Amino acid sequence: GTEPLMDEAIQKRGYVEVGYCSVMGTHDEVVRSLRPDNWQDNAYLNTWRIYQTINGMEVTGDLDFGVDATFGFTLQDRQQILTNKGEGITMEYGQLYKGDKPLIRLVAINKYAHWNFKPAARVIWDFFRHFSRDMKTKKLMYTE
């Protein structure tokens, strides 16, 4: 289970910030994407909550797919990206902020599994390229 990881995140809450980008495929049969019938104890949601905790952010509670049909809760900077991978295969993403810093980006690939999806690599890089760490203080830095 994720209890040991959550315990570690609770211990470090507020002492460290870590950027995180998660990519899920809505048709992945190995790591199931979020759905109204499976979100409780879902691996994606558990991981997002761990990163929210360690970053000292508000932790997502129960999901409501009426609020957001893909993720079940409100994300900022919500976007959809068309791909050339086939009919209906699009990417959606949004972000969670701590103050004015987007620390967590969540990406869903519609009608696709999550692995080896080259367009997702660009979305991931476009997120992480803004981060660096101050070598003295170890503080996470974010630049536009």
Language model feature labels by segment:
Residues 109-110, 117-144:
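Catalytic active-site module of serine/aspartate enzymes centered on a nucleophile-bearing elbow/loop
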